[in-house]
A protein has these predicted regions:
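Tryptophan-anchored aromatic micro-motifs
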Residues: 24-45
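Short, solvent-exposed aromatic-acidic interface loops
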Residues: 35-37, 60-67, 94-101
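Short, exposed beta-strand-loop hairpins at the edges of beta-sheets
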Residues: 127-129, 133-149
Length: 151
């Protein structure tokens, strides 16, 4: 019985905290190119995800087209996240910074982006599956949205 207690003690104080700590401090740094088409409207952008220690930022840079009109997109979405279980992450936007070169009208942004990308204190769930040590598939609901290439 003493051996079992000693083994449990060793496993708990050496192995388990490392596993818990690894889940709490997921570090993800990757970049995805994404195109979105809604009728005559199109967005082509690069999304850079930087996540570590329950906070992160998504840097968005690209262009949007509506007929002959062309708009620049340049935004930074700062957020906190919580790993709910497995690969399920709940993100909460903290600050959304629109860079001066961003010319996308707010109405068009609202029509084509979830509010998480536009306003503070908005929530969004992502499934983030590791493909290998650096790359990830990021899904919204059950639809893969980004293949994110790591560094």
């Amino acid at each position: 019985m003493k051996k079992i207690k000693w083994l449990a003690f060793l496993l708990f104080f050496t192995g388990l905290p490392q596993q818990v700590d690894a889940n709490a401090n997921d570090k993800i740094v990757c970049e995805a190119k994404h195109s979105l088409y809604h009728g005559q409207f199109a967005i082509k952008a690069t999304y850079r995800f930087i996540m570590n220690d329950n906070s992160g930022v998504i840097l968005i840079n690209g262009t949007a087209h509506l007929g002959p009109e062309r708009y620049a997109i340049s935004r930074e979405v700062y957020f906190n996240y919580k790993r709910q279980s497995g690969d399920d992450y709940l993100l909460t936007s903290q600050r959304v910074y629109t860079n001066p070169i961003d010319t996308l009208p707010e109405l068009l942004a609202q029509q084509h982006y979830p509010s998480f990308f536009l306003k503070e204190n908005k929530k969004l769930n992502f499934l983030i599956n590791s493909v290998n040590q650096t790359d990830y598939i990021i899904s919204f609901v059950s639809t893969p949205l980004f293949y994110c290439n790591g560094e």
